[in-house]
């Protein structure tokens, strides 16, 4: 029985690396996968899932208007699919998460989603919110803060390295823009720590 999975974390926990390893494992056994990534994130070139450790793979793009169920159903007409993998799943809409649940429930294909849980203000992304609510299986991928504690928050930095507290939820960037930290250091750096 297929399931909808959500692998979530803060930045730099290895989400894309884990996705690429999963795709490789399926392909090594002559099983077909379909990999998607968000069109909005073109840091490494449009249509590529790229890991910080240097591995990458071509991927189909999704944007807010994509009907993932219909795209995947059309693809099935030409090729059997054994798994769907979604990178940057935080950028999915509520409707797209529902569409992916239909891929699982109606097409019986497992869907593995990888994404951030929260943004730089510790608020859920739309895609993450509904994956946390509707996924059959949740798994947190862990990374560490500079102090050694588990990092489960992310700070947004400006060009000078100062913490940014306000702004648009979505701003594409990597290590130069974001820093994964523990809850204590998130509160401390954003001025939300009680004295």
UniProtKB/Swiss-Prot annotation:
It is found in: Cytoplasm. The keyword Oxidoreductase does not apply. Disulfide bonds: none annotated. PROSITE patterns: TK_CELLULAR_TYPE. GO terms for cellular component: cytosol. Its main location: cytoplasm. Zn(2+) binds at residues 145, 147, 182, 185. It catalyses: thymidine + ATP = dTMP + ADP + H(+). One of its GO terms (biological process) is thymidine metabolic process. ATP binds at residues 9-16, 87-90. The active site is at residue 88. GO terms for molecular function: ATP binding; thymidine kinase activity; zinc ion binding. It is an enzyme of class 2 (transferase). Gene3D superfamilies: 3.30.60.20, P-loop containing nucleotide triphosphate hydrolases (3.40.50.300). The keyword Transferase applies. Its EC number is 2.7.1.21. Keywords: ATP-binding, Cytoplasm, DNA synthesis, Kinase, Metal-binding, Nucleotide-binding, Transferase, Zinc. Homotetramer. Belongs to the thymidine kinase family. HAMAP family: Thymidine_kinase. This is Thymidine kinase. It comes from Mannheimia succiniciproducens (strain KCTC 0769BP / MBEL55E). The gene is tdk.
């Amino acid at each position: 029985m297929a399931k909808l999975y959500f692998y979530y974390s803060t930045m730099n926990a290895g989400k894309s690396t884990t996705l690429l390893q999963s795709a490789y494992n399926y392909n090594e056994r002559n099983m077909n996968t379909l990999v998607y990534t968000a069109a909005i994130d073109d840091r490494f070139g449009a249509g590529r899932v790229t890991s910080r450790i240097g591995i990458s793979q071509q991927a189909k793009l999704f944007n807010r208007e994509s009907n993932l169920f219909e795209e995947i159903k059309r693809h099935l007409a030409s090729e059997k699919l054994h798994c769907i993998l979604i990178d940057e799943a935080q950028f999915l809409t509520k409707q797209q998460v529902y569409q992916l649940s239909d891929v699982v429930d109606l097409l019986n294909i497992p869907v593995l989603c990888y994404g951030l849980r929260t943004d730089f203000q510790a608020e859920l992304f739309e895609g993450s919110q509904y994956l946390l609510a509707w996924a059959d299986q949740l798994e947190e991928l862990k990374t560490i803060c500079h102090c050694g504690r588990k990092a489960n928050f992310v700070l947004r930095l400006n060009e000078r390295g100062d913490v940014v507290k306000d702004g648009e939820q979505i701003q594409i960037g990597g290590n130069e823009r974001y820093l994964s930290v523990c809850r204590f250091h998130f509160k401390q750096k954003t001025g939300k720590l009680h004295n």
